[in-house]
Amino acid sequence: MGTDSNSGHLLQAKRFELLFRVTPLALCIAAMAIMLKNKQSNQYGALHYSDVGGFKYLVYANGICAIYSILSLLGSVLSTGIDYSWTRAWIMFILDQALTYLILTAGVCGVEIMDLAYQGNEQVSWSRVCVSYGKFCNDARASVLITMAVLVCFMVLSLLSAHRLFSKYEAPIVNNGHHTDFSQN
Protein backbone atom coordinates (compact mmCIF):
# COMPACT_ATOMS: atom_id res chain seq x y z
CA MET A 1 0.00 0.00 0.00
CA GLY A 2 2.81 2.41 0.84
CA THR A 3 4.55 1.75 -2.48
CA ASP A 4 1.39 2.38 -4.52
CA SER A 5 0.72 5.57 -2.57
CA ASN A 6 4.32 6.72 -3.05
CA SER A 7 4.21 5.90 -6.77
CA GLY A 8 0.93 7.81 -7.14
CA HIS A 9 2.41 10.77 -5.31
CA LEU A 10 5.48 10.75 -7.59
CA LEU A 11 3.31 10.56 -10.70
CA GLN A 12 1.21 13.47 -9.48
CA ALA A 13 4.37 15.47 -8.73
CA LYS A 14 5.68 14.75 -12.24
CA ARG A 15 2.41 15.97 -13.79
CA PHE A 16 2.60 19.12 -11.67
CA GLU A 17 6.18 19.67 -12.82
CA LEU A 18 5.22 19.14 -16.48
CA LEU A 19 2.51 21.78 -16.10
CA PHE A 20 5.07 24.24 -14.74
CA ARG A 21 7.50 23.39 -17.54
CA VAL A 22 4.97 23.95 -20.35
CA THR A 23 3.29 27.07 -18.89
CA PRO A 24 6.38 29.33 -19.00
CA LEU A 25 6.98 28.23 -22.59
CA ALA A 26 3.62 29.65 -23.67
CA LEU A 27 4.06 32.74 -21.51
CA CYS A 28 7.59 33.44 -22.81
CA ILE A 29 6.39 33.19 -26.39
CA ALA A 30 3.47 35.53 -25.63
CA ALA A 31 5.72 38.09 -23.89
CA MET A 32 8.20 37.98 -26.77
CA ALA A 33 5.51 38.28 -29.45
CA ILE A 34 3.95 41.31 -27.79
CA MET A 35 7.28 43.06 -27.31
CA LEU A 36 8.66 42.19 -30.76
CA LYS A 37 5.61 43.82 -32.40
CA ASN A 38 5.70 46.79 -30.05
CA LYS A 39 6.15 50.07 -31.93
CA GLN A 40 4.34 53.36 -32.24
CA SER A 41 4.79 56.48 -34.36
CA ASN A 42 3.38 59.95 -33.81
CA GLN A 43 4.32 63.60 -34.37
CA TYR A 44 7.24 63.20 -31.92
CA GLY A 45 8.79 60.31 -33.85
CA ALA A 46 8.81 56.54 -33.98
CA LEU A 47 9.42 54.35 -30.96
CA HIS A 48 10.30 50.66 -31.27
CA TYR A 49 11.08 48.16 -28.51
CA SER A 50 14.63 47.79 -29.87
CA ASP A 51 15.25 51.47 -29.08
CA VAL A 52 15.28 50.53 -25.39
CA GLY A 53 18.13 48.24 -24.35
CA GLY A 54 16.22 46.86 -21.38
CA PHE A 55 13.36 45.76 -23.61
CA LYS A 56 15.80 43.98 -25.92
CA TYR A 57 17.17 42.19 -22.84
CA LEU A 58 13.61 41.23 -21.88
CA VAL A 59 13.06 39.69 -25.32
CA TYR A 60 16.38 37.81 -25.21
CA ALA A 61 15.73 36.52 -21.69
CA ASN A 62 12.25 35.31 -22.65
CA GLY A 63 13.74 33.62 -25.71
CA ILE A 64 16.38 31.83 -23.64
CA CYS A 65 13.77 30.76 -21.10
CA ALA A 66 11.47 29.50 -23.87
CA ILE A 67 14.28 27.39 -25.34
CA TYR A 68 15.14 26.05 -21.89
CA SER A 69 11.46 25.29 -21.28
CA ILE A 70 11.30 23.25 -24.48
CA LEU A 71 14.47 21.32 -23.63
CA SER A 72 13.53 20.69 -20.00
CA LEU A 73 9.99 19.71 -21.00
CA LEU A 74 11.35 17.22 -23.54
CA GLY A 75 13.76 15.89 -20.94
CA SER A 76 10.96 15.43 -18.44
CA VAL A 77 8.60 13.79 -20.94
CA LEU A 78 11.23 11.50 -22.42
CA SER A 79 12.69 10.41 -19.08
CA THR A 80 12.27 6.68 -18.66
CA GLY A 81 11.47 6.71 -14.97
CA ILE A 82 9.76 8.96 -12.52
CA ASP A 83 12.84 9.36 -10.31
CA TYR A 84 15.86 11.45 -11.34
CA SER A 85 19.48 10.43 -10.91
CA TRP A 86 21.72 12.50 -8.66
CA THR A 87 23.48 14.07 -11.63
CA ARG A 88 20.26 14.98 -13.40
CA ALA A 89 18.76 16.35 -10.18
CA TRP A 90 21.80 18.61 -9.69
CA ILE A 91 21.78 19.77 -13.32
CA MET A 92 18.05 20.58 -13.23
CA PHE A 93 18.43 22.37 -9.90
CA ILE A 94 21.31 24.55 -11.15
CA LEU A 95 19.64 25.33 -14.48
CA ASP A 96 16.27 26.08 -12.88
CA GLN A 97 18.00 28.46 -10.45
CA ALA A 98 19.98 30.17 -13.22
CA LEU A 99 16.95 30.67 -15.46
CA THR A 100 14.91 31.94 -12.51
CA TYR A 101 17.52 34.61 -11.87
CA LEU A 102 17.75 35.44 -15.57
CA ILE A 103 14.01 36.03 -15.91
CA LEU A 104 13.99 37.88 -12.56
CA THR A 105 16.57 40.37 -13.82
CA ALA A 106 14.69 40.82 -17.11
CA GLY A 107 11.38 41.36 -15.31
CA VAL A 108 12.84 43.85 -12.83
CA CYS A 109 14.57 45.69 -15.67
CA GLY A 110 11.23 45.91 -17.49
CA VAL A 111 9.44 47.15 -14.37
CA GLU A 112 12.06 49.87 -13.86
CA ILE A 113 11.80 51.01 -17.48
CA MET A 114 8.01 51.10 -17.23
CA ASP A 115 8.23 53.14 -14.04
CA LEU A 116 10.47 55.66 -15.80
CA ALA A 117 8.21 55.68 -18.87
CA TYR A 118 5.09 56.39 -16.78
CA GLN A 119 6.57 58.60 -14.04
CA GLY A 120 9.58 60.15 -15.75
CA ASN A 121 12.63 61.42 -13.88
CA GLU A 122 13.27 65.14 -14.13
CA GLN A 123 16.73 64.86 -12.53
CA VAL A 124 18.04 62.93 -15.53
CA SER A 125 15.81 64.69 -18.08
CA TRP A 126 13.63 61.62 -18.67
CA SER A 127 10.14 62.79 -19.56
CA ARG A 128 6.91 60.83 -19.18
CA VAL A 129 6.98 58.89 -22.43
CA CYS A 130 3.65 57.14 -21.90
CA VAL A 131 1.76 60.43 -22.21
CA SER A 132 2.73 60.52 -25.89
CA TYR A 133 3.16 56.80 -26.60
CA GLY A 134 0.22 55.18 -24.81
CA LYS A 135 -0.13 52.13 -27.06
CA PHE A 136 3.59 51.41 -26.85
CA CYS A 137 3.50 51.61 -23.06
CA ASN A 138 0.39 49.43 -22.79
CA ASP A 139 1.98 46.72 -24.93
CA ALA A 140 5.27 46.96 -23.03
CA ARG A 141 3.41 46.73 -19.72
CA ALA A 142 1.57 43.60 -20.92
CA SER A 143 4.87 41.99 -21.92
CA VAL A 144 6.47 42.85 -18.58
CA LEU A 145 3.48 41.50 -16.63
CA ILE A 146 3.58 38.25 -18.59
CA THR A 147 7.32 38.05 -17.90
CA MET A 148 6.57 38.37 -14.18
CA ALA A 149 4.14 35.44 -14.52
CA VAL A 150 7.02 33.50 -16.13
CA LEU A 151 9.09 34.39 -13.07
CA VAL A 152 6.46 32.85 -10.77
CA CYS A 153 6.52 29.64 -12.84
CA PHE A 154 10.31 29.46 -12.68
CA MET A 155 10.23 30.09 -8.93
CA VAL A 156 7.91 27.09 -8.54
CA LEU A 157 10.21 25.01 -10.77
CA SER A 158 13.18 26.06 -8.64
CA LEU A 159 11.37 24.92 -5.51
CA LEU A 160 10.41 21.61 -7.14
CA SER A 161 13.93 20.89 -8.36
CA ALA A 162 15.38 21.89 -4.97
CA HIS A 163 12.97 19.53 -3.23
CA ARG A 164 13.74 16.74 -5.68
CA LEU A 165 17.49 17.19 -5.18
CA PHE A 166 17.69 17.72 -1.44
CA SER A 167 15.17 15.02 -0.58
CA LYS A 168 17.78 12.54 -1.89
CA TYR A 169 20.00 13.33 1.09
CA GLU A 170 19.74 11.68 4.49
CA ALA A 171 18.67 13.72 7.49
CA PRO A 172 21.65 15.08 9.43
CA ILE A 173 23.02 13.15 12.39
CA VAL A 174 22.42 15.01 15.63
CA ASN A 175 23.07 14.36 19.34
CA ASN A 176 23.87 10.79 20.36
CA GLY A 177 23.87 9.50 16.78
CA HIS A 178 20.08 9.80 16.33
CA HIS A 179 18.69 10.87 12.97
CA THR A 180 16.18 13.69 12.89
CA ASP A 181 13.15 12.85 10.75
CA PHE A 182 11.78 16.10 9.36
CA SER A 183 9.12 14.37 7.26
CA GLN A 184 6.84 13.69 10.24
CA ASN A 185 4.73 16.40 11.85
Swiss-Prot record:
One cellular component (GO) term of this entry: plasma membrane
Cell compartment(s), UniProt: Cell membrane
Listed PANTHER family: CASP-LIKE PROTEIN 2A1, CASP-LIKE PROTEIN 4A4
InterPro entries (UniProt xref): CASP/CASPL (IPR006459), CASP_dom (IPR006702)
Bilayer disposition of the protein: Multi-pass membrane protein
Main localization category: membrane
Similarity remark: Belongs to the Casparian strip membrane proteins (CASP) family.
Residues in compartment: Extracellular: 37-57, 112-141
Membrane-crossing residue ranges in chain numbering: 16-36, 58-78, 91-111, 142-162
UniProtKB keywords: Cell membrane, Membrane, Transmembrane, Transmembrane helix
One protein family per Pfam: CASP_dom
SUBUNIT field: Homodimer and heterodimers.
Source organism: Picea sitchensis
Parts of the chain on the Cytoplasmic side: 1-15, 79-90, 163-185
Name by which UniProt lists this protein: CASP-like protein 2A1
